[in-house]
From Swiss-Prot:
Keywords: ATP-binding, Chaperone, Cytoplasm, Nucleotide-binding. The gene is hslU. InterPro entries: AAA+_ATPase (IPR003593), ATP-dep_Clp_protease_ClpX (IPR050052), ATPase_AAA_core (IPR003959), Clp_ATPase_C (IPR019489), HslU (IPR004491), MCM_dom (IPR001208), P-loop_NTPase (IPR027417). ATPase subunit of a proteasome-like degradation complex; this subunit has chaperone activity. The binding of ATP and its subsequent hydrolysis by HslU are essential for unfolding of protein substrates subsequently hydrolyzed by HslV. HslU recognizes the N-terminal part of its protein substrates and unfolds these before they are guided to HslV for hydrolysis. HAMAP family: HslU (MF_00249). It comes from the Bacteria. It holds the Pfam family MCM. Its main location: cytoplasm. This is ATP-dependent protease ATPase subunit HslU. GO terms for biological process: protein unfolding; proteolysis involved in protein catabolic process. The lineage of its organism: Bacteria, Pseudomonadati, Pseudomonadota, Alphaproteobacteria, Rickettsiales. It comes from Rickettsia prowazekii (strain Madrid E). It is found in: Cytoplasm.
């Protein structure tokens, strides 16, 4: 069956704003203003790359502040945008950080983690490019162990054919592989001085690099298992690590997207509690300022400039207001988008319309047991009704409420599906009511169950 997922390529960076919105519409319901804002931000990156001369360096991304309750699509919009363009994407909650000088994570770890993601992305692409050569070299190593290095070419070809067609998968061989056990156990980490740019150093990594990481050990394993170990080893030898790091840093600097959630939780409010907490929250905001405006962060891969990284901050702002953020931080998030609360119609669309909708997901899961689920329109409407009711009466968690409702609705079917003789189940409004009405009408119970 042909996959409905888009093949995400870097070429997608050249998509027009309307094309970007259309792609987002495949997975996300509503929130047109937010989609439009991120589509323009992404297109401006493409435009900037086409600007010639020194002016290109002066054009910086217009960072975005998304305002909206949980479960309305803030994170999903940013995540899908990054996936669409294969951009390094890093999501973090603002509450995870402490002010420089205090124990805890400092904000510069955002960039270190973003670069790590970029390096892993580039390394995966490089391994795909050398996969054929790596596989050939892996087979040669297995043949050395199987028939010896001095065996004739005829013998090697004969056994190579058997390895390739899987005849020898369960044959045990003795082969030398890289010893991946970290030096000294690898569990000893040295925290740097608070606020230092390098974060945490692993002593095992440092010693391993000093020794050249060339330690090997002989292991007995089946040929099919040996292939899964040796191919990555050979790939590592074939790829240019320095080139990968350079490309990864460039990718992070020019295409990276950082999503900072719960930024409202570090805003100072007039009715806030302890004064020390206020100072700490304001300190985190001040630490974020240079990062968002543009600075250079030292990482284990080298210095990384943040000038052209797109920052998307978000928060519900139920208690604090955007104006409670430091004025300097507000100025560095010039584009503000308010996301709408989800209506009953939105809930129905979320259940049905996206390519990876919840109904399709649950139907596919139960379908693996050869049980076909069929939802009537009345059932979908009833599920949406219950989701809105519980969100209003208990706590509004947006579309995430649909997950808990569907889990409770289909609990018995999920448990019994593997042993069911019935191969088709129709979920109608009566079924939904029978399964959920007792929970919905008892709000005290709903608080715990839904």
């Amino acid at each position: 069956m042909k996959s409905t997922e888009t093949t995400y390529k870097k070429d997608n960076m050249g998509l027009t704003p309307s094309q970007i919105v259309n792609e987002l519409n495949r997975f996300i319901v509503g929130q047109d203003k937010a989609k439009k804002a991120v589509a323009i931000a992404l297109r401006n990156r493409y435009r900037r790359k086409r600007v010639e001369g020194n002016l290109r360096n002066e054009i910086v991304p217009k960072n975005i502040l998304m305002i909206g309750s949980t479960g309305v699509g803030k994170t999903e919009i940013a995540r899908r945008l990054a996936k669409l363009t294969n951009s390094p994407f890093y999501k973090i909650e603002a509450t995870k950080f402490t002010e420089v000088g205090y124990v805890g994570r400092d904000v510069e770890s955002i960039i270190r983690d973003l670069v790590e993601i970029a390096v892993n992305t580039e390394k995966a692409l490089a391994k795909i490019a050398v996969d054929i050569n790596a596989r050939e070299k892996a087979i040669e190593r297995i043949l050395d162990s199987l028939v010896g290095k001095t065996s004739s070419s005829e013998t090697r070809e004969k056994f190579k054919a058997k390895v390739l067609n899987g005849e020898l998968d369960d044959t045990e061989i003795e082969i030398s592989v890289a010893d991946t056990t970290p030096v000294g156990g690898g569990g000893f980490e040295i925290p740097c001085i608070p606020g230092a740019s390098m974060g945490v150093l692993n002593l095992g990594d440092m010693i391993g690099r000093a020794l050249g990481n060339s330690k090997t050990k002989t292991k007995k394993m089946l040929i099919k298992d040996a292939m899964t170990v040796i191919i990555p080893e050979e790939s590592e030898k074939l790829i240019d690590q320095e080139k990968i790091i350079q490309k990864a840093i460039n990718l992070a600097e020019n295409d990276g997207i950082v999503f900072i959630d719960e930024i409202d939780k570090i805003a100072s409010t007039s009715n806030a509690g302890a004064k020390n907490a206020e100072i700490s929250r304001e300190g985190v905001q001040r630490d974020l300022l240079p990062l968002i405006e543009g600075t250079t962060v030292n990482t284990k891969y080298g210095p990384v400039k943040t000038d052209h990284i797109l920052f998307i901050a978000s928060g519900a702002f139920h208690i604090a207001k955007p104006s409670d953020l430091l004025p300097e931080l507000q100025g560095r998030l010039p584009i503000r988008v308010e996301l709408n609360l989800l209506t009953k119609d939105d809930m129905i669309k979320i259940l049905l319309e996206p390519e990876t909708s919840l109904i399709k997901q649950y139907s596919a899961l139960i379908g693996t047991e050869e049980v076909h689920l069929e939802f009537t329109d009345a059932a979908i409407e009833k599920i949406a009704d219950y989701a809105i009711t519980v969100n209003l009466e208990v706590e509004d968690i947006g579309a995430r409420r649909l997950h808990t409702i569907l889990e409770n609705l289909l609990e018995d079917i999920s448990f019994e599906a593997s042993e069911m003789k019935v191969k088709k189940i129709i979920i109608d409004d009566k079924f939904v009511e029978n399964q959920l009405s007792k929970i919905i009408t008892n709000l005290d119970l709903a608080k715990f169950v839904l």
